[in-house]
Amino acid sequence: MKGGKRVQPARPNRINKEIRATEVRLTGVDGEQIGIVSLNEALEKAEEAGVDLVEISPNAEPPVCRIMDYGKFLYEKSKSTKEQKKKQKVIQVKEIKFRPGTDDGDYQVKLRNLIRFLEDGDKAKITLRFRGREMAHQQIGMEVLNRVKKDLTEDSDLAVVESFPTRIEGRQMIMVLAPKKRQ
């Protein structure tokens, strides 16, 4: 829609004249309790301090209001939410494909990659694919998966097995490893 009115997003807290209560429980600029006062008195005190009267808890009886700089309050709030988002780690599932005949050199390279994924905190999905006549030798595939499991869970204590295949699904077996939680 072109040329439409831009709607201001609703504020989460009421400030100054938007507060509807007749009496409020007032908190000062530094967080000290002032007590229960009339709305007009609270607005005067906020005006004297040169800042806003912000309704913190509207559902309380009487509503809790604080004398503070609302712009600074919003800035601090957005800053803290950004910090929390930064700290969150998105866990990805990385996949490595093996074959029953994977040679020792290739196995070591793939194992190094698995170790790197787990150290970075990502889950690892190991897919073992069977082609053609390899389907007749499923026990070789299980040996490869057991070797990976042994190298990563028992020997290096890096991972926890989330799912281990009991049978073949289609032409492949899938094992999922999760990184061990660090203390």
Swiss-Prot record:
TM helices/strands, residue ranges: none
GO molecular function: ribosome binding; translation initiation factor activity
GO biological process annotation, one example: ribosome disassembly
Subcellular location: Cytoplasm
Keywords annotated in UniProt: Cytoplasm, Initiation factor, Protein biosynthesis
GO cellular component terms listed in the entry, alphabetical order: cytosol; membrane
HAMAP family in alphabetical order: IF_3
Biological function: IF-3 binds to the 30S ribosomal subunit and shifts the equilibrium between 70S ribosomes and their 50S and 30S subunits in favor of the free subunits, thus enhancing the availability of 30S subunits on which protein synthesis initiation begins.
Assembly notes: Monomer.
PANTHER family: TRANSLATION INITIATION FACTOR IF-3 (PTHR10938), TRANSLATION INITIATION FACTOR IF-3, MITOCHONDRIAL (PTHR10938:SF0)
Similarity remark: Belongs to the IF-3 family.
Name of protein: Translation initiation factor IF-3
Organism whose genome encodes this protein: Yersinia enterocolitica serotype O:8 / biotype 1B (strain NCTC 13174 / 8081)
